[in-house]
């Protein structure tokens, strides 16, 4: 999927969420939501590694699926933050990760 199209779809979804629940999707909300999602991803890692209470344990397949969903939430909220801050992430990736890099 095209990166910009993905970002547009995620932002539209976030805006729909805000409208449905009467929440203003602004920079404050997006940053705090990103923190929340990172925490949920960390919890999913603990569960995946069985470093949790026994009643929270899942099968390998279930925990891997939860990891993927929580990481998708982290990336999604990062994209919402980029949109709200008017940051071109494609250009930022190019400059930060790929420009003048060897190997």
Walk through the language-model features, giving the residues of each.
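Flexible "arm" and connector segments at domain edges
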Residues: 1-71, 75-103
């Amino acid at each position: 999927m095209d990166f910009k199209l993905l970002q547009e779809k995620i932002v539209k979804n976030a805006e729909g969420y805000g409208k449905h629940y009467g929440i203003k999707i602004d920079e404050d909300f997006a940053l705090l939501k990103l923190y929340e999602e990172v925490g949920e991803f960390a919890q999913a890692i603990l569960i995946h590694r069985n470093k949790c209470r026994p009643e929270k344990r899942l099968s390998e397949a279930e925990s891997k699926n939860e990891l993927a969903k929580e990481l998708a939430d982290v990336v999604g909220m990062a994209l919402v933050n980029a949109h709200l801050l008017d940051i071109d992430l494609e250009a930022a990736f190019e400059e930060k990760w790929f420009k003048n890099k060897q190997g």
